[in-house]
Amino acid sequence: MTHLNSGLGTSKVTAETVNGYVKITVVAGSQPVTQYYVAKPNDPAIYMATYLTGEINPGELRFLARLRRSAVPNGWHGDAAVLDGCTAFEGKDTFKCPNGQTRCKMYTADRFIEDQVHGVTGKNVGIWMIMPGTAYETSSGGPFMRDINTQSGDDQELYWYMNSGHVRTEDWRFGLHGPYAMQFT
């Protein structure tokens, strides 16, 4: 299952075939955002772009894939966000583990300037978020901003944050976020 933010509510969804490619457009009914998906025959990737014309609620813009953890159990940065046996003590974001460690999905973050590929893996499989340098041009926070990449709970969560509400350093930037892709290997 994938979604943008925590969902876009009632949306207008259209699908069409353009020169052999499948293009899906999702226009949010209550948010100033349009999400595009493109799939090409025999290409193991879903190409995406997000067009934003104003601030959204809740105050962050992210793509999230909730994946079957049994297929892709390995998150980004090792055990940094593996929550097995751990107990939440700060909302649902920070956990204390029986061995005394703390775990948090924030620990999987990389600076945007260095984060062009991150993903999750399993036996003979990987699922990767690929963000070329241009994908971050409209992201707020600048090149040294960072945000969540993965979290391993009941599901394996794979994120791409475009505008973060976690540590907001400037006004949001609007326009096209992307292109970016979710690649299956």
Give, region by region, the residue ranges found by the protein language model.
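Sequence-level detector for tyrosine residue identity
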Residues: 21, 36-37, 47, 51, ...
